[in-house]
Amino acid sequence: MAIKTENFILNIGPQHPSTHGVFRLRIVLDGEVITDLEPVFGYLHRGIEKLAEGRTYLQDIPFTDRLDYLGSMTNNHAYVMAVEKLAGITVPERAEYIRVILDELQRIASHLAGLGFFLNDLGALQTPLLYMFREREKIVELFDMCSGQRLNYNYYRFGGFVQDLPEEFLPALKILLDTLPGFIDEYEQLISTNEIVLIRTKGVGVLKRDLAINSSAAGPVLRASGINWDIRRNDPYSIYNRFEFDIPIAKNGDTYDRYMIRILEMRQSVRILRQAVKDLPEGEIMGKAPKLLKPPAGEVYSRIEGPKGELGFYLVSDGTDKPYRWRVRPPCLLNLSALKDMVVGWKVADLMAIFGSIDIVMGEVDR
């Protein structure tokens, strides 16, 4: 007589060090193998979209910092660009260059944090994380110079910036650009050919091309599955069409490819930054924008390529100083929706390696 067995339901979280926020995973196990997964989120819901509809357009900028708080600069950019499009505000050329510089620095800083935490989840405790935070600290110091903040920068404004970059910013940035490629080489020497990392990541947590498209995956997760899609190239915004850079694409869609895409993207960000610093013009940093903004009635959707993927803002104006509708398209939520396709069939021991490779920030998921 065959022995009857039952699947085991295991809850991970909502307070777990590898979820990087309050988030619960409800997984169904057949022995050690995952047969089903349900992500349970909402623990960090703050009602940001509804709160934003009760405040002026300017007062809503700090809300964007608190979505993906590891990508605050790009969040600022996505939102102010949507409002500028809605209100017909022109941004000076110098301000556009500064925005590209800050966006690419933010991309590198976000990837450094994401990769450090990912390797921590793999079991490489502390050492790779501290190596990567060593370089991230230099970027945070640059952000501190221009915004006065190390987190939640609130630096962008409609039409540009209130304050120009301080004079010590560019010399410090040039030093960083000279040294950062060598440190990325160091990361690769330590990690990319490490036997344990390869065993834990190669062929693990594969997201197939069609599933990546069907789940609306974004950013490095999408490109690791072989989809050549990056808003900077496919729907250029700001002045990205002036720069030469490549879009890293992988083909296997596994945990290793998602790691490698971020390594390659940091190299391309350095390439963009060097061009932007070289071509940075003099001039105004603030376009003509009223202090109390009342965009004409209408609606707009604007998107950028953030560190985690396509970040979009949908705004509806009724002609007053407050938005009638304020909606975020968060890449972290979309990437999280693809998690089940990645983990089913793998052992529970592989779960955190796969989850860490999609680099989720719950502030953006729950909003």
Curated annotation (Swiss-Prot):
Protein localization: Cell membrane
InterPro entries tied to this protein: NADH_Q_OxRdtase_suD, NADH_UbQ_OxRdtase_49kDa_CS, NDH1_su_D/H, NiFe-Hase_large
This enzyme's EC code(s): 7.1.1.-
Predominant subcellular localization, coarse grouping: membrane
Gene3D superfamilies from the UniProt entry: Cytochrome-c3 Hydrogenase, chain B
UniProt topology in membrane: Peripheral membrane protein
Highest taxon, organism lineage: Bacteria
GO MF entry, a single one: NADH:ubiquinone reductase (non-electrogenic) activity
Catalytic reaction annotation: a quinone + NADH + 5 H(+)(in) = a quinol + NAD(+) + 4 H(+)(out)
Pfam families associated with the record: Complex1_49kDa
Keywords: Cell membrane, Membrane, NAD, Quinone, Translocase, Transport, Ubiquinone
Signal sequence range: none
Transmembrane segments: none
GO CC entries: plasma membrane
Family: Belongs to the complex I 49 kDa subunit family.
Main function: NDH-1 shuttles electrons from NADH, via FMN and iron-sulfur (Fe-S) centers, to quinones in the respiratory chain. The immediate electron acceptor for the enzyme in this species is believed to be ubiquinone. Couples the redox reaction to proton translocation (for every two electrons transferred, four hydrogen ions are translocated across the cytoplasmic membrane), and thus conserves the redox energy in a proton gradient.
NCBIfam families on file: PRK06075.1 (NF004739)
PANTHER family (UniProt xref): NADH DEHYDROGENASE [UBIQUINONE] IRON-SULFUR PROTEIN 2, MITOCHONDRIAL, NADH-UBIQUINONE OXIDOREDUCTASE 49 KDA SUBUNIT
Complexes and interactors: NDH-1 is composed of 14 different subunits. Subunits NuoB, C, D, E, F, and G constitute the peripheral sector of the complex.
The protein's name in its UniProt record: NADH-quinone oxidoreductase subunit D
Organism: Dehalococcoides mccartyi (strain ATCC BAA-2100 / JCM 16839 / KCTC 5957 / BAV1)
Species classification: Bacteria, Bacillati, Chloroflexota, Dehalococcoidia, Dehalococcoidales
Chain's gene name: nuoD
